[in-house]
Amino acid sequence: MAALDLRAELDSLVLQLLGDLEELEGKRTVLNARVEEGWLSLAKARYAMGAKSVGPLQYASHMEPQVCLHASEAQEGLQKFKVVRAGVHAPEEVGPREAGLRRRKGPTKTPEPESSEAPQDPLNWFGILVPHSLRQAQASFRDGLQLAADIASLQNRIDWGRSQLRGLQEKLKQLEPGAA
């Protein structure tokens, strides 16, 4: 009876793994299409604005990321990756900025001007009226970044499923030495 339950669990795990692999293949195809679309739109923008108008010379001297990648623990110890806007703080970052005791009397520090919470849109580096193809390139790469995080999470789930599959196969071999 235990071997029968183990085989049923093994079958359901194989079906889940195959579904995840199919989803991974689809997301990789979409990611490749988004990246290709982004580079093509960037080439169109360079053609429209001129090769020297869209290039590294127009980048800001001080760049800040617009998005960050956060890894979090999901069920069964799996890591799940998520793309988060840079201005959004994680719950563990909320709180007092200085640790320790404060001196209430005495010399006061002048607060340092902090950068704005929301980073500036990088498209403004190339002028106010940028071509639509440059905005399309930015959107394509942004979608690609989200897809890359989804693919990384899915790949972790597939690796976890494969290790579970191997463990169940070993248990089945121990229960039925002549089978499997």
From Swiss-Prot:
Underlying gene: VMA22
Region of interest: Disordered: 92-122
Keywords noted in UniProt: Coiled coil, Congenital disorder of glycosylation, Cytoplasmic vesicle, Disease variant, Endoplasmic reticulum, Endosome, Lysosome
Record's subunit section: Accessory component of the multisubunit proton-transporting vacuolar (V)-ATPase protein pump.
Chief localization: other
GO molecular function, one term: unfolded protein binding
Official protein name in the record: Vacuolar ATPase assembly protein VMA22
Bias kind Basic and acidic residues: ranges: 92-101
Classification via PANTHER family: COILED-COIL DOMAIN-CONTAINING PROTEIN 115
Coiled-coil ranges per UniProt: 16-37, 153-176
Tissues and organs where the protein is expressed, per its UniProt entry: Expressed throughout the brain.
Endoplasmic reticulum in keyword set: yes
Cited function: Accessory component of the proton-transporting vacuolar (V)-ATPase protein pump involved in intracellular iron homeostasis. In aerobic conditions, required for intracellular iron homeostasis, thus triggering the activity of Fe(2+) prolyl hydroxylase (PHD) enzymes, and leading to HIF1A hydroxylation and subsequent proteasomal degradation. Necessary for endolysosomal acidification and lysosomal degradation. May be involved in Golgi homeostasis.
Subcellular location: Endosome; Lysosome; Endoplasmic reticulum-Golgi intermediate compartment; Cytoplasmic vesicle, COPI-coated vesicle
Any one GO BP annotation for this protein: lysosomal lumen acidification
